[in-house]
């Protein structure tokens, strides 16, 4: 089923970047900004709050713009926000990250809900159960791959001391930029959707 294949692939591709953020940002705040684990945890807390808030808007957004346009534009926004996490220098206030994380949580929620629902939209009744299981497994794999990918990129930049000018914080900044760009590029996967895809869900 085409929508299932594209949904699974898009889910995996976009989560590579998205899943790296909850690890990289607290790590950067602790290492580069010399803050406690508690402080770094509170910095990313708004992501969960806005994610819950976004749930009430997902259906309205999908009904108005459709799945294809929503996922492509939303992925671009998420990637741009991840890139923005690399803007502040080491002398900036850590509270600069709060509005970015809050907005990111909102769009993440839209992304996850849209990807999960379109993935099983065209499955037949006897395929729905196994389809849901595969979507769930794919999510777990994507989270693991995303964390690993983020750490690999960070390690690469940390080993390039001339590139980061012997400043660990610059390694994090370049990592966020790389992860953000990857996320933006992953949005092209959703071009394989048709404008009419998900119409059966939108009418409900």
Walk through the language-model features, giving the residues of each.
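12-transmembrane solute porter fold
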Residues: 1-158, 167-197
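Short, Lys/Arg-enriched, Gly/Pro-containing loop segments at transmembrane-helix junctions
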Residues: 162-164, 196-204
């Amino acid at each position: 089923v085409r929508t299932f294949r594209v949904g699974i692939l898009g889910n995996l591709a976009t989560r590579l970047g998205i899943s790296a953020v909850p690890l990289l940002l607290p790590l950067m705040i602790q290492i580069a900004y010399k803050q406690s684990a508690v402080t770094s945890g509170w910095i990313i807390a708004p992501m969960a709050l806005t994610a819950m808030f976004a749930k009430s808007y997902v259906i309205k957004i999908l009904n108005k713009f459709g799945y294809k346009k929503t996922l492509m534009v939303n992925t671009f926004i998420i990637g741009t926000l991840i890139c923005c996490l690399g803007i502040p220098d080491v002398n900036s206030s850590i509270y600069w990250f709060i509005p970015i994380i809050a907005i990111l949580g909102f769009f993440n929620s839209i992304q996850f809900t849209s990807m999960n629902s379109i993935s099983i939209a065209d499955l037949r009744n006897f395929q729905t159960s196994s389809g849901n299981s595969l979507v769930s497994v794919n999510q777990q794999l994507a989270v693991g791959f995303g964390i690993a990918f983020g750490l690999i990129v960070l390690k690469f930049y940390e080993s390039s001391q001339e590139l980061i000018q012997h400043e660990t914080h610059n390694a994090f900044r370049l990592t966020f930029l790389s992860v953000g760009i990857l996320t933006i590029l992953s949005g092209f996967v959703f071009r394989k959707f048709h404008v009419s895809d998900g119409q059966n869900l939108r009418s409900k």
